[in-house]
Amino acid sequence: MKPLSPLTLSFFLFVFITNLSLAFSNEDVEQVLDFNGNPIFPGVQYFILPAIRGPAGGGVRLGRTGDLTCPVTVLQDRQEVKNGLPVKFVIPEISPGIIFTGTPIEIEYTKKPNCAKSSKWLVFVDNVIQKACVGIGGPENYPGVQTLSGLFKIEKHESGFGYKLGFCVKGSPTCLDVGRFDNDEDGRRLNLTEHESFQVVFIQAEANDAEFIKSVV
Protein backbone atom coordinates (compact mmCIF):
# COMPACT_ATOMS: atom_id res chain seq x y z
CA MET A 1 0.00 0.00 0.00
CA LYS A 2 1.34 3.43 -0.95
CA PRO A 3 2.15 5.48 2.17
CA LEU A 4 0.33 8.76 2.70
CA SER A 5 2.31 11.92 2.04
CA PRO A 6 2.94 14.34 4.94
CA LEU A 7 0.58 16.84 3.24
CA THR A 8 -2.22 14.26 3.09
CA LEU A 9 -1.66 13.29 6.71
CA SER A 10 -1.77 16.95 7.73
CA PHE A 11 -5.04 17.41 5.84
CA PHE A 12 -6.72 14.41 7.50
CA LEU A 13 -5.48 15.58 10.90
CA PHE A 14 -6.90 19.05 10.26
CA VAL A 15 -10.29 17.63 9.24
CA PHE A 16 -10.36 15.35 12.29
CA ILE A 17 -9.54 18.16 14.73
CA THR A 18 -12.03 20.52 13.06
CA ASN A 19 -14.87 17.99 13.22
CA LEU A 20 -13.99 17.12 16.80
CA SER A 21 -14.09 20.79 17.79
CA LEU A 22 -17.43 21.27 16.07
CA ALA A 23 -18.85 18.22 17.81
CA PHE A 24 -17.89 19.58 21.21
CA SER A 25 -18.96 23.16 20.47
CA ASN A 26 -22.38 22.05 19.17
CA GLU A 27 -22.99 19.51 21.92
CA ASP A 28 -25.71 21.58 23.61
CA VAL A 29 -27.07 23.25 20.46
CA GLU A 30 -30.62 22.32 19.51
CA GLN A 31 -33.37 23.67 17.30
CA VAL A 32 -35.63 26.19 19.02
CA LEU A 33 -39.24 24.99 19.30
CA ASP A 34 -42.49 26.81 19.97
CA PHE A 35 -44.85 25.87 22.78
CA ASN A 36 -46.49 23.19 20.63
CA GLY A 37 -43.17 21.56 19.79
CA ASN A 38 -42.89 22.96 16.27
CA PRO A 39 -39.63 24.49 15.00
CA ILE A 40 -39.30 28.27 15.16
CA PHE A 41 -38.72 29.81 11.73
CA PRO A 42 -37.47 33.26 10.70
CA GLY A 43 -40.14 35.64 9.45
CA VAL A 44 -43.03 33.85 11.20
CA GLN A 45 -44.93 35.82 13.85
CA TYR A 46 -44.75 34.67 17.47
CA PHE A 47 -45.90 35.89 20.84
CA ILE A 48 -43.27 35.90 23.58
CA LEU A 49 -44.99 34.76 26.76
CA PRO A 50 -43.87 33.75 30.26
CA ALA A 51 -43.33 30.01 30.52
CA ILE A 52 -45.44 29.88 33.67
CA ARG A 53 -48.61 31.98 33.50
CA GLY A 54 -50.32 33.65 36.42
CA PRO A 55 -48.96 36.44 38.61
CA ALA A 56 -45.90 36.42 36.35
CA GLY A 57 -47.95 38.49 33.87
CA GLY A 58 -48.59 38.29 30.14
CA GLY A 59 -46.78 38.85 26.87
CA VAL A 60 -44.45 41.64 25.80
CA ARG A 61 -45.52 44.86 24.10
CA LEU A 62 -44.51 48.50 23.80
CA GLY A 63 -45.03 51.36 26.23
CA ARG A 64 -43.84 54.84 27.14
CA THR A 65 -41.43 55.09 30.08
CA GLY A 66 -39.47 57.81 31.83
CA ASP A 67 -38.94 60.96 29.78
CA LEU A 68 -39.34 59.20 26.43
CA THR A 69 -42.00 60.82 24.25
CA CYS A 70 -42.60 57.74 22.09
CA PRO A 71 -43.81 54.31 23.32
CA VAL A 72 -40.61 52.47 22.40
CA THR A 73 -39.81 50.58 25.61
CA VAL A 74 -40.43 46.82 25.56
CA LEU A 75 -42.63 45.93 28.53
CA GLN A 76 -44.17 42.75 29.84
CA ASP A 77 -47.90 43.26 30.36
CA ARG A 78 -49.05 42.86 33.95
CA GLN A 79 -52.23 41.03 32.90
CA GLU A 80 -51.69 37.33 32.28
CA VAL A 81 -54.47 37.21 29.66
CA LYS A 82 -52.73 39.74 27.41
CA ASN A 83 -50.48 38.24 24.75
CA GLY A 84 -48.75 41.48 23.82
CA LEU A 85 -47.53 42.23 20.29
CA PRO A 86 -46.23 39.54 17.95
CA VAL A 87 -42.58 39.56 16.96
CA LYS A 88 -40.60 37.90 14.21
CA PHE A 89 -37.04 36.64 14.30
CA VAL A 90 -34.51 37.49 11.60
CA ILE A 91 -31.16 35.79 11.01
CA PRO A 92 -28.97 38.62 9.64
CA GLU A 93 -26.26 36.34 8.31
CA ILE A 94 -26.32 33.60 5.67
CA SER A 95 -28.01 30.56 7.22
CA PRO A 96 -30.06 27.47 6.37
CA GLY A 97 -33.12 29.27 7.76
CA ILE A 98 -33.17 27.30 11.01
CA ILE A 99 -32.96 28.95 14.42
CA PHE A 100 -30.85 27.00 16.88
CA THR A 101 -30.09 27.88 20.48
CA GLY A 102 -27.34 30.47 20.37
CA THR A 103 -28.06 31.60 16.80
CA PRO A 104 -27.46 35.38 16.52
CA ILE A 105 -30.81 36.93 15.60
CA GLU A 106 -32.61 40.24 15.30
CA ILE A 107 -36.01 40.55 16.96
CA GLU A 108 -38.58 42.98 15.62
CA TYR A 109 -42.21 43.78 16.16
CA THR A 110 -44.63 43.40 13.30
CA LYS A 111 -46.18 46.78 14.20
CA LYS A 112 -44.65 49.98 15.53
CA PRO A 113 -45.72 53.51 16.43
CA ASN A 114 -45.16 56.18 13.76
CA CYS A 115 -42.74 58.00 16.03
CA ALA A 116 -40.33 55.04 15.97
CA LYS A 117 -38.05 54.75 12.95
CA SER A 118 -37.52 51.01 13.34
CA SER A 119 -39.41 48.10 14.86
CA LYS A 120 -36.20 46.19 15.65
CA TRP A 121 -35.27 45.53 19.25
CA LEU A 122 -32.27 47.37 20.65
CA VAL A 123 -30.83 48.10 24.08
CA PHE A 124 -30.69 51.54 25.69
CA VAL A 125 -29.20 52.60 29.01
CA ASP A 126 -31.66 54.32 31.36
CA ASN A 127 -29.46 56.47 33.57
CA VAL A 128 -32.26 57.13 36.06
CA ILE A 129 -32.76 53.50 37.05
CA GLN A 130 -29.22 52.46 36.03
CA LYS A 131 -30.48 49.63 33.83
CA ALA A 132 -29.83 48.55 30.25
CA CYS A 133 -33.37 48.14 28.91
CA VAL A 134 -34.85 46.68 25.73
CA GLY A 135 -36.63 48.99 23.33
CA ILE A 136 -37.16 49.67 19.62
CA GLY A 137 -36.53 52.61 17.32
CA GLY A 138 -33.21 54.36 16.89
CA PRO A 139 -30.90 56.84 18.62
CA GLU A 140 -33.30 59.67 17.76
CA ASN A 141 -35.86 58.08 20.10
CA TYR A 142 -33.38 58.21 22.99
CA PRO A 143 -31.91 61.74 23.09
CA GLY A 144 -28.96 61.95 25.44
CA VAL A 145 -29.19 58.22 26.14
CA GLN A 146 -26.65 55.56 25.19
CA THR A 147 -27.88 52.80 22.87
CA LEU A 148 -26.07 49.50 22.39
CA SER A 149 -25.70 47.68 19.08
CA GLY A 150 -25.71 43.91 19.03
CA LEU A 151 -27.71 40.78 18.37
CA PHE A 152 -30.07 38.70 20.44
CA LYS A 153 -30.10 34.95 20.88
CA ILE A 154 -32.35 32.24 22.32
CA GLU A 155 -31.04 29.74 24.86
CA LYS A 156 -32.59 26.95 26.90
CA HIS A 157 -33.64 28.14 30.35
CA GLU A 158 -31.69 26.78 33.30
CA SER A 159 -34.84 25.13 34.68
CA GLY A 160 -35.02 22.86 31.62
CA PHE A 161 -38.44 24.22 30.64
CA GLY A 162 -38.81 27.04 28.17
CA TYR A 163 -36.19 29.44 26.93
CA LYS A 164 -34.45 32.67 27.80
CA LEU A 165 -33.35 35.56 25.62
CA GLY A 166 -29.83 36.93 25.59
CA PHE A 167 -28.11 39.96 24.09
CA CYS A 168 -24.52 40.10 22.83
CA VAL A 169 -22.92 43.52 22.47
CA LYS A 170 -21.44 44.15 19.01
CA GLY A 171 -17.65 43.97 18.93
CA SER A 172 -17.46 42.60 22.46
CA PRO A 173 -17.48 39.12 24.02
CA THR A 174 -20.07 40.40 26.50
CA CYS A 175 -23.42 38.56 26.42
CA LEU A 176 -26.09 39.01 29.08
CA ASP A 177 -29.47 37.41 29.72
CA VAL A 178 -32.72 39.33 29.35
CA GLY A 179 -34.61 39.62 32.61
CA ARG A 180 -37.40 41.77 34.01
CA PHE A 181 -37.37 44.90 36.15
CA ASP A 182 -40.41 46.36 37.90
CA ASN A 183 -40.19 50.14 38.01
CA ASP A 184 -43.85 50.66 38.99
CA GLU A 185 -44.81 51.55 35.43
CA ASP A 186 -47.41 50.30 32.96
CA GLY A 187 -45.54 47.00 32.74
CA ARG A 188 -42.31 45.30 33.69
CA ARG A 189 -39.30 46.37 31.66
CA LEU A 190 -37.13 43.85 29.87
CA ASN A 191 -33.53 44.52 30.84
CA LEU A 192 -30.09 42.96 30.64
CA THR A 193 -29.16 41.03 33.75
CA GLU A 194 -26.58 38.70 35.24
CA HIS A 195 -29.16 37.34 37.66
CA GLU A 196 -32.65 35.92 37.08
CA SER A 197 -33.52 35.57 33.39
CA PHE A 198 -37.02 35.88 31.94
CA GLN A 199 -38.31 32.33 31.35
CA VAL A 200 -40.34 32.37 28.14
CA VAL A 201 -42.12 30.29 25.52
CA PHE A 202 -43.08 31.15 21.95
CA ILE A 203 -46.59 30.76 20.55
CA GLN A 204 -47.24 31.24 16.86
CA ALA A 205 -49.54 34.17 16.20
CA GLU A 206 -52.41 33.55 13.82
CA ALA A 207 -53.60 36.29 11.49
CA ASN A 208 -56.91 36.55 13.31
CA ASP A 209 -55.54 36.33 16.87
CA ALA A 210 -57.30 38.64 19.28
CA GLU A 211 -55.59 40.69 21.97
CA PHE A 212 -56.50 38.12 24.62
CA ILE A 213 -55.40 34.50 24.79
CA LYS A 214 -55.93 31.54 27.03
CA SER A 215 -53.35 30.60 29.64
CA VAL A 216 -50.72 28.21 28.31
CA VAL A 217 -50.13 26.52 31.67
Curated annotation (Swiss-Prot):
Sorted alphabetically, the keyword list is: Disulfide bond, Glycoprotein, Protease inhibitor, Secreted, Serine protease inhibitor, Signal
**What's the protein called, per UniProt?**
Kunitz-type trypsin inhibitor-like 1 protein
The species this protein was found in: Pisum sativum
User: Which Pfam family name is an example for this entry?
Assistant: Kunitz_legume
Q: List the disulfide bonds.
A: 70-115, 168-175
Q: Where is the signal peptide?
A: 1-26
**SUPFAM superfamilies reported in the protein's UniProt record:** STI-like (SSF50386)
Compartments it resides in: Secreted
Q: Which family does it belong to?
A: Belongs to the protease inhibitor I3 (leguminous Kunitz-type inhibitor) family.
Which PANTHER family does the protein's record reference?
KUNITZ FAMILY TRYPSIN AND PROTEASE INHIBITOR PROTEIN, KUNITZ TRYPSIN INHIBITOR 2
